[in-house]
Amino acid sequence: MKLTSLQVADYMTPNPLTVAPEEPLLRAVEIIRLRGVRRLPVTVGGMLVGLVTDGDLKRAEPSMLTDSEEDFNRVMEATPISRIMIQNPTTTTADTLLVDAAEVLLNTKYGALPVVAGGRVVGIISVNDFMRALVEILREAEGNRGS
């Protein structure tokens, strides 16, 4: 494995689940909880307009002092994703070198980069994806050292 040839496409999650800005926060919460993802690209007609994270949603949730689950759901159903999403998030492309994307990710606060082609979301690469790459690289290096 040649480190300088590894690209985002080699480790990204292709065709991630997305949400629309007008959808309610409750929809994003449901997707994140049911699918076990931590970030959702926000799109209009396939074009990236934002990113919503599990942390954004937790900060936006009504207080635990909300009288009932019904009140909680009502607030989350009435609030659009656009109200809390990260607008114009930093992105990368599938053919970007993995090391370059990692450097970009270090300068963001949301733990993932949407992968775009012509403004359309084609994937997402997260800290976990970079960790998977690191494990593979280290295992290969360890194997080469033992040869």
Give names to the regions the model predicted.
Residues M1-G36, L40, P80:
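A contiguous, well-structured "functional interface" segment within a domain
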Residues M1-N15, T53-T90, L97, A102-L106, ...:
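Tandem CBS (Bateman) regulatory domains
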Residues V19-G36, T43-V44, T91-K109, V116:
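The conserved cystathionine-beta-synthase
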Residues I32, L40-D56, L105, L113-N128:
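A glycine-centered beta-loop-beta connector
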Residues R33-P41, A60-S63, D67:
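Short, charge-rich amphipathic segments
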Residues R39, G46-M47, S68-D71, A78-P80, ...:
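Short, surface-exposed, polar/charged, turn-prone segments marking secondary-structure boundaries
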